[in-house]
Amino acid sequence: MPSHADLDRQISQLRECKFLGEAEVRALCEQAKAILMEEWNVQPVRCPVTVCGDIHGQFYDLIELFRIGGDSPDTNYLFMGDYVDRGYYSVETVTLLVALKVRYRDRITILRGNHESRQITQVYGFYDECLRKYGNANVWKYFTDLFDYLPLTALVENQVFCLHGGLSPSLDTLDNIRALDRIQEVPHEGPMCDLLWSDPDDRCGWGISPRGAGYTFGQDIAQQFNHTNGLTLISRAHQLVMEGFNWCQDKNVVTVFSAPNYCYRCGNMAAILEIGENMDQNFLQFDPAPRQIEPDTTRKTPDYFL
């Protein structure tokens, strides 16, 4: 098992955007799996904590996020998924977050996004990046096996419910979510799929999602869910919002998106949500880090958003 000294060396190397060797990644993922196995589908989190949305392999913007929000472990973080795909540095991004989780398990919470899946990563870049950087798919397999263990949701001080996507018509209560068997590939449909794929919508009730997975849910649904479960807010990611954060559904729901200039061309700001000692909320917005020299990519990934 890597010692603290080994982990500190690996974290320093990763902060310079230098990926680890295959054997080191394997050992790191095994350690992370042992930690995540002990976490819950609804993982309790204490305040203060800083809540972050999609990162999508934009490594230098993750470093900028830590510069703006405070470094790990000095600041407690809760990441709501989508660490990989689309950006140029999915390997370095996800390895750094997993290494921080192993080193400072109580200081950082990492949830599962819809891109933390075998099927999606084979289309949107992470699989190809692993092949390019390691010459085989082993590292992709270590990480996608680990993704099955990531918690689906988190609950900050029993008040703020955090997850990647949104609500499910199959899940009325947090106890329903606690009862799910999460240790599997993200299904194509059903409650676990919905948590990672659904979106809030201006229309009331449940709707068919244009994404082809999950549902859209109206303000009435969010209000009822919050009331039933004693919540003040649903915090989620999963959608590009131009200011980095967006309140909707009469402030029952907030979207947080933490990949600035998404896909290196969308022109959006990023944001993170600081939840303070007294559960006060503060958004920090940030622009992209200075552009680095872009690596040659061997395959163009599809343009449409997932």
Swiss-Prot record:
<keyword id="KW-0464">Manganese</keyword>
<keyword id="KW-0479">Metal-binding</keyword>
<feature type="binding site">
    <location>
        <position position="54"/>
    </location>
    <ligand>
        <name>Mn(2+) 1</name>
    </ligand>
</feature>
<protein>
    <recommendedName>
        <fullName>Serine/threonine-protein phosphatase PP2A-1 catalytic subunit</fullName>
        <ecNumber>3.1.3.16</ecNumber>
    </recommendedName>
</protein>
<feature type="binding site">
    <location>
        <position position="56"/>
    </location>
    <ligand>
        <name>Mn(2+) 1</name>
    </ligand>
</feature>
<dbReference type="GO" id="GO:0005829">
    <property type="term" value="C:cytosol"/>
</dbReference>
<feature type="binding site">
    <location>
        <position position="164"/>
    </location>
    <ligand>
        <name>Mn(2+) 2</name>
    </ligand>
</feature>
<dbReference type="InterPro" id="IPR029052">
    <property type="entry name" value="Metallo-depent_PP-like"/>
</dbReference>
<dbReference type="InterPro" id="IPR006186">
    <property type="entry name" value="Ser/Thr-sp_prot-phosphatase"/>
</dbReference>
<feature type="binding site">
    <location>
        <position position="114"/>
    </location>
    <ligand>
        <name>Mn(2+) 2</name>
    </ligand>
</feature>
<dbReference type="GO" id="GO:0005634">
    <property type="term" value="C:nucleus"/>
</dbReference>
<comment type="similarity">
    <text>Belongs to the PPP phosphatase family. PP-2A subfamily.</text>
</comment>
<keyword id="KW-0378">Hydrolase</keyword>
<dbReference type="GO" id="GO:0004722">
    <property type="term" value="F:protein serine/threonine phosphatase activity"/>
</dbReference>
<feature type="active site" description="Proton donor">
    <location>
        <position position="115"/>
    </location>
</feature>
<feature type="binding site">
    <location>
        <position position="82"/>
    </location>
    <ligand>
        <name>Mn(2+) 2</name>
    </ligand>
</feature>
<dbReference type="InterPro" id="IPR004843">
    <property type="entry name" value="Calcineurin-like_PHP_ApaH"/>
</dbReference>
<dbReference type="Pfam" id="PF00149">
    <property type="entry name" value="Metallophos"/>
</dbReference>
<keyword id="KW-0904">Protein phosphatase</keyword>
<dbReference type="GO" id="GO:0000278">
    <property type="term" value="P:mitotic cell cycle"/>
</dbReference>
<dbReference type="InterPro" id="IPR047129">
    <property type="entry name" value="PPA2-like"/>
</dbReference>
<feature type="binding site">
    <location>
        <position position="238"/>
    </location>
    <ligand>
        <name>Mn(2+) 2</name>
    </ligand>
</feature>
<keyword id="KW-0963">Cytoplasm</keyword>
<dbReference type="GO" id="GO:0046872">
    <property type="term" value="F:metal ion binding"/>
</dbReference>
<feature type="binding site">
    <location>
        <position position="82"/>
    </location>
    <ligand>
        <name>Mn(2+) 1</name>
    </ligand>
</feature>
